[in-house]
């Protein structure tokens, strides 16, 4: 498998960060074509002798997009329509990428990837703990949002004979009440 990165912003480049597949794993004339993925970001480029410095969010972005890349590159499926990230439902396609984000808040991992730009020293444990605490602040509300999305999905797909306004009924129920709309 192959993996390429284009990390820095430049004129004419669209914003955001993403992983894209250049080549998917498939069988061609009896031989396996190995997958190739590329990761594109828009981080601040190095200036002169000063390196590009990444925020915690930037590092999470790299790990997240690399999770998509791993999903694509490690596939064993040779049927093009379902190889790598192709044909994977949107909620499932995020699993490997969100899993990879967890490594950013792992002390052992952070010790290997963080170094002070001038001294070369690794991040102090106290600073790491503060970053984790800040990251986790309000995490309960993010979980509530995910539960709301899951509940919406369940309620929508449980209805075998939906009415014209089923979506609106479910949304109104989730937004303004707590009991099930059924």
What residues fall within each predicted segment?
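Active-site recognition of the HExxH zinc-binding catalytic motif
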Residues: 57-72
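A glycine-rich beta-turn/hairpin centered on an aromatic-Pro dipeptide
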Residues: 142, 146-171
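Short loop/turn segments at secondary-structure transitions that flank enzyme active sites
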Residues: 9-11, 45-47, 76, 103-106, ...
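Active-site-adjacent "gating/activation" loops or surface patches in catalytic cores
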Residues: 1-54
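Acidic/histidine-rich catalytic neighborhood
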Residues: 72-150
């Amino acid at each position: 498998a192959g993996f390429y990165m284009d990390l820095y912003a430049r004129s004419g480049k669209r914003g955001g960060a993403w992983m894209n597949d250049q080549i998917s794993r498939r069988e061609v004339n009896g031989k396996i074509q190995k997958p190739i993925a590329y990761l594109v970001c828009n981080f601040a480029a190095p200036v002169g002798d000063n390196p590009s410095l990444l925020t915690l969010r930037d590092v999470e972005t790299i790990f997240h997009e690399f999770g998509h890349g791993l999903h694509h590159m490690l596939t064993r499926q040779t049927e093009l329509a379902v190889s790598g990230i192709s044909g994977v439902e949107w909620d499932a396609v995020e699993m490997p990428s969100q899993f990879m984000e967890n490594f950013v808040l792992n002390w052992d991992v952070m010790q290997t990837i963080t170094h002070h730009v001038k001294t070369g020293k690794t991040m102090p444990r106290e600073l790491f703990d503060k970053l984790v605490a800040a990251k986790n602040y309000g995490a309960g509300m993010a979980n509530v949002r995910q539960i709301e999305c899951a509940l919406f999905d369940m309620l929508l797909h449980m209805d075998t004979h939906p009415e014209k306004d089923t979506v609106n009924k479910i949304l109104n129920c989730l937004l303004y009440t707590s009991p099930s709309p059924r």
